[in-house]
Amino acid sequence: MASRSLTDLNEILVDAYNKACAEYLSLYPDKSQPFITCTYRSNDEQNALYAYGRTRMGNKVTNAQAGQSPHNYKPSAAFDIAFIGLGKKLDWSKNNFRLFADIIAKIQPLVVCGIDFKSLPDAPHFELKDWRKYVK
């Protein structure tokens, strides 16, 4: 199972995520709040996701095969989030992701959000710009 642990995440991302969460809560205390759904992901998990829309039923969810995703390294150069609201209900409103992306971009310009990806937009995804420079 993919990790949700901040200890598996690049320190730049940990700092940016924590600061962005605090600011988001301060600005939007009554809105659904972000939480981490994935930091590190194994190559097997990556290949399973890559199969969607190709050899497995469903829509494509990634363009990255194993080793091509910033999630596939430790520390991870990416994280995914979701939002949880009242009653522990998941909230996938694109507006929440946009608000969080704008906050994190101001806090740490090295972090980019997949909401603006051209080939396969991925609003829950945040990664280090030029992430390959940060992985081994």
Question: Predicted regions span which residues?
Answer:
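Structured segments of extracytoplasmic/periplasmic soluble domains
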Residues: 19-27, 46-53, 103-110
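Cytochrome P450 catalytic domain signature, combining two hallmark sequence patches
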Residues: 53-68
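Acidic helix-start/capping segments at beta-turn-to-alpha-helix junctions
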Residues: 36-49
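Active-site acidic/histidine clusters and adjacent loop/turn architecture
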Residues: 1-38
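Residue-level detector of short coil/turn "hinge" positions at structural boundaries
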Residues: 33-34, 56, 111-113
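Catalytic cores and adjacent binding grooves of peptidoglycan-active enzymes
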Residues: 64-136
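Generic secondary-structure microfeatures
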Residues: 38-40, 53, 83-85
